[in-house]
């Protein structure tokens, strides 16, 4: 089916995620936190949704954008780098991407970077002229080089990019970097950022108009609630009115303070949702500023 062909009407939503790899478990955990559960098929590639009519396809990450573009899946959780690589390749072939990043999902952060041999004295992108650059992301790299006005040769490799300079097949590389340990092990150093990346929820540009539309809206609302609460805690305490302004200044990453019904002790009963780390040091600062009876609670679910 081509990207321009309308997908047949379905009453079940399909989501593609990695079968294995660094995004597989976080993606499945995120969807489970949204209330989804599945029954796995014998081939372990298809998971039938039991709690809701939302099925999973377990595939290679580089298959996910195409499955969305062709209407086989409605959504996918995939690295932004993979999504953009295939979109750039489609643009170069005169095809619409037919998919887009709906929202980031808070994991899988990495950077696509140029890395050169450690002995290089790096002065800037002008040094790339005439060089051979090995990468698994040729379309992204070609677009980036074009924007920089650099004429260099892109050497496409499907794996083991980091050994290309030692093998003599390239002068430098463009590859994903998380910790930098792999680069260091191959006597390479990162020198230039090409793209920031993270895992994203990708979806078709044309949203479904059948029974899936309601499922999609519900899933996105649940996911927003899960993502908002991922690093959030409910903070409850008592305080005198004269201390409220000082306490509010100590909570710049929190929602507005909510006053609860009086418990008869004279002080105000307050609560707020904190969206950053609530450390012991932070609680002690609040206590010194007048907060009493501090409690930090984990919140599992929320509908905004």
UniProtKB/Swiss-Prot annotation:
One example GO MF annotation? magnesium ion binding
**GO terms for biological process, alphabetical:** L-histidine biosynthetic process
**Catalytic activity field:** 1-(5-phospho-beta-D-ribosyl)-ATP + diphosphate = 5-phospho-alpha-D-ribose 1-diphosphate + ATP
Q: How is its activity regulated?
A: Feedback inhibited by histidine.
Q: Which domain of life is it from?
A: Bacteria
Entry keyword annotation includes Glycoprotein: no
The UniProt entry's GO CC annotations, sorted and at most eight, read:
cytoplasm
> Mind telling me what this protein is named?
ATP phosphoribosyltransferase
């Amino acid at each position: 089916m081509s990207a321009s062909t309308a997908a047949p009407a379905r009453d079940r939503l399909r989501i593609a995620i990695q079968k294995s790899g660094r995004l597989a478990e976080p993606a499945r955990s995120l969807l489970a936190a949204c209330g989804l559960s599945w029954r796995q098929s014998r081939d372990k590639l298809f998971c039938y949704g039991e709690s809701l009519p939302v099925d999973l396809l377990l595939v290679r990450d580089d298959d996910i954008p195409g499955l969305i573009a062709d209407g086989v899946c409605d959504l996918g959780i995939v690295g932004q780098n993979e999504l953009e690589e295939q979109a750039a390749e489609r643009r170069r072939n005169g095809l619409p991407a037919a998919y887009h990043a709906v929202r980031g999902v808070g994991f899988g952060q990495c950077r696509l970077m140029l890395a050169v041999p450690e002995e290089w004295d790096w002065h800037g992108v002008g040094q790339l002229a005439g060089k051979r650059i090995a990468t698994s992301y040729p379309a992204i790299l070609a677009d980036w080089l074009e924007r920089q006005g650099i004429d260099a040769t892109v050497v496409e490799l499907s794996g083991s990019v980091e050994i290309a300079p030692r093998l003599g097949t390239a002068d430098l590389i463009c590859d994903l970097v998380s910790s930098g340990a792999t680069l260091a092990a191959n006597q390479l150093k990162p020198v230039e950022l090409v793209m920031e990346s993270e895992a994203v929820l990708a979806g078709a540009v044309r949203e479904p108009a059948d029974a899936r539309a309601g499922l999609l809206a519900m899933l996105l609302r649940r996911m927003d609630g899960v993502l908002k609460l991922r690093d959030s805690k409910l903070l409850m305490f008592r305080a005198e009115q004269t201390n409220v302004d000082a306490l509010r200044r100590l909570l710049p990453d929190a929602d507005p303070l909510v006053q609860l019904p009086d418990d008869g002790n004279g002080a105000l009963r307050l609560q707020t949702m904190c969206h950053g780390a609530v450390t012991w040091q932070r609680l002690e600062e609040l206590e010194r500023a007048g907060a009493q009876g501090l409690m930090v609670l984990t919140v599992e679910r929320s509908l905004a």
